[in-house]
Amino acid sequence: MACCEPKDNSKKSLWKTSLVFMTVKVLIHYSFHFIVPLFFVKIFFKDNWKEAFAIMLLTMLIDLDHLLASPIFDASRCSIGYHPLHTVYAAIFYLMLSFSPSWKLKAVSIGCLWHLSTDYIDCLL
């Protein structure tokens, strides 16, 4: 390989920095955070779906742990395992909440676990 030839992964990295890719990534990420929970509440919380949807949206507050990082936002950083409320230990706690008899705590559990899933999907993109 000559010194100036692009590496094999240069097309992939060029694609990942393209405006189209970044736009699609942002659309997927935020629709998963704000639209998909509506489907969860319609399935699991039919009687209290509006309250459950509000609770699930409030689970976005776990992103406040990003304020502890420097820089606060880094598009190339994976949140999972980096921020305190995005760790395996936090996920275990969120999972334990799902065993509560309270539907509100179950909504918090599903919201937080879906939030972590969404952030993990973002890491894979």
Question: Model features per residue range: what roles?
Answer:
Residues 1-125:
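N-terminal membrane-targeting hydrophobic helices
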